[in-house]
């Protein structure tokens, strides 16, 4: 399922272990190369990313949660270290405070078919339009 176009943008979710790379680091650095993805399905998602698409940054450890939003600033492309892999550049947009926890997402009852719930090991995935709309209602302070 490709990222859902909503107002011309597509939306994705990318997971990270905050001990490896956190939203705080992305905010400080302003931009990063998103790499380290190995799963074939997640690599396909990275390759589909285009400049202007939005990516929800999800901390996968501790209390799992969507913690921020980034914008894709370069298209998905082969990883220069390993052409079988793919990378994309992300630019920090905003933090989501309070973070949207996995418990909160599950409790909404709206996203049982989303890969975030069904395929918990998948590191990068499209975000459904319903999630984007729900998040805009739940956290209106973060504009994306």
Task: Map each language-model feature to its residues.
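Aromatic- and Lys/Arg-enriched surface recognition patch
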Residues: 66-125, 129
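Compositionally biased, charged N-terminal/linker segments
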Residues: 1-51, 139-144
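Hydrophobic/aromatic beta-strand segments within beta-rich folds
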Residues: 14, 51-55, 122-124
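Short, acidic Gly/Pro/Ser/Thr-rich loop/turn segments
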Residues: 19-21, 97, 132-134
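Charged phosphate-binding loop/patch that engages nucleotide di/tri-phosphates or the phosphate backbone
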Residues: 127-144
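Short, charged beta-turn/beta-strand-edge "cap" motif at the junction between a beta-strand
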Residues: 58-64
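A generic structural signal for short beta-strands and their flanking turns/coil linkers
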Residues: 10, 30, 51-53, 66-68, ...
